[in-house]
Amino acid sequence: MIAIVDYGAGNIFSVKNALDFLGLESQLTDDAAAIQAADAIILPGVGAFPSAMQMLKERHLVSVLQTESKKKPFLGICLGMQLIFEKGYEFEACDGLGLIPGTVEKIPANGLIIPHMGWNKLEYQIDCPLLHDLGEEAYVY
């Protein structure tokens, strides 16, 4: 079973629907015991780094995520991926889960629209097996 962490800051239903489509057993949960019993963990997220960390703290999920991430596959999606770093600087400096060394810094705009949302052509910098079936000039969102 895959635990999809429900801490009030994620697009959890699209993740659940994707796993259902793939025929994978999953559960939306904010329960530490369910996360501990899971075979894998997905931490989705939408919103701001500081408020998301506060919601994880309020649900007493920080230590369970830190512990369980060392034992089983763990995937952070969007904000959830940012939260796995040591610190984030969105709005204010805020400690993250510390699963990966490093910080999440604001990208300087330099005349660009940030955040950018829309379709773009992939430009490969390195060979990546995950992208082989997409083609050399695939458009992605």
What are these regions (language model features)?
Residues 119-141:
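Active-site oxyanion/phosphate-handling segment shared across diverse enzymes
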